[in-house]
A protein has these predicted regions:
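Amphipathic terminal alpha-helices
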Residues: 280-296
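Residues within alpha-helical segments
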Residues: 24, 58-61, 91, 193, ...
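Rossmann-fold NAD(P)H-dependent dehydrogenase/reductase core
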Residues: 2-223, 292-296
Length: 296
């Protein structure tokens, strides 16, 4: 069993310190996000937990402070399903932070029943892609000011199943929870690709990561047979701490090729659709149109 886990989980460690650095982690109250915050705080970073549920965020911050001596963690309200909340969060960051060296777009919803965001977008596309797209847009000036800086978009190993349905991005014609989810995860990689090409010369690096198959709260909407598999074959599934390895690898390893996709702490091959520069450019333009912004 230990041999199998060795194939599934690539162990990785680093002694890099982050004293004087500031990081934002979305969806930081549980799972991979919480473990990411813990590691960054342990390296001396000031870490902002960007969370929708402040009660859960307070508990996460308390847990981290117990594990990490003198942890510099701060809680901020962020609802990625509401552009007004995203604007308020960004305004608060500019008013309270002098720099931002690391933005980890980790939050996500998965395979949930059909619903829409406050702005009318299908929830998985709206939160997983558009919410983080808008957040990154609003924080880009601070990231550029703090360069060298890094943006990390958490995608998924299931992105090859995805297709960008430009004619029905919000799944209004035909909603299927899995199709909507994999579309959003493919969008994460296309966004990474396009953003990297635009900001590399400004000192901002951008990476997409696959955390692997991880046992987290995001599985709560999965069908019962899949939940049974997760529980039965748990030894094959990463812990949240293990799921954070690749995010941390990209955050802490210097000179990695920007715009690339990483899995198990190494650069990985993504699907043909995820390498389509025309789709990446089109998704960028459509996302700007949907959000009512101009981002050149």
């Amino acid at each position: 069993m230990s041999v199998l886990r060795g194939l599934i989980v690539k162990r990785w460690s680093s002694d890099v310190r982050l004293d004087g650095k500031t990081a934002i982690v979305t969806g930081a109250n549980t799972g991979i996000g919480k473990e990411t915050v813990k590691d960054l705080a342990n390296r001396g970073a000031r870490v902002i937990l960007a969370c929708r549920d402040l009660v859960k965020a307070e508990q996460a911050a308390s847990d981290i402070s117990k594990d990490v001596e003198n942890a510099n963690v701060v809680i901020r309200k962020l609802d990625l399903a509401d552009t007004k909340s995203i604007c308020e969060f960004a305004e608060l960051i500019y008013n309270t932070e002098k720099s931002l060296h690391l933005l980890i777009n980790n939050a996500g919803v998965a395979i949930c029943p059909y619903s829409t965001t406050a702005d009318g977008f299908e929830t998985q596309f709206g939160v997983n892609h558009l919410g983080h797209f808008f957040l990154t847009f609003l924080l880009m000036d601070l990231l550029k000011h703090s360069a060298p800086s890094t943006v990390i978009n958490v995608s998924s190993l299931v992105h090859p199943m995805g297709k960008i349905h430009f004619e029905d991005l919000n799944s209004e014609k035909n909603y299927h929870p899995v199709k909507a989810y994999v579309q959003s995860k493919l969008a994460n990689i296309l966004f990474t690709r396009e953003l990297a090409s635009r900001v590399e010369e400004l000192g901002v690096r951008v990476y997409a990561v696959d955390p692997g198959l991880v046992n987290t709260d995001i599985t709560r909407h999965l069908m019962k047979p899949v939940q049974f598999f997760v529980k039965t074959f748990g030894f094959m599934i990463k812990t949240p701490a293990e799921g954070a390895y690749t995010t941390l690898y990209c955050a802490l390893t210097p000179d990695l090729p920007t715009g690339s996709y990483y899995s198990n702490c190494t650069v990985a091959s993504c699907s043909r659709a995820a390498k389509d520069d025309n789709s990446a450019s089109k998704l960028w333009a459509v996302s700007c149109h949907l959000l009512g912004i101009r981002w050149r």
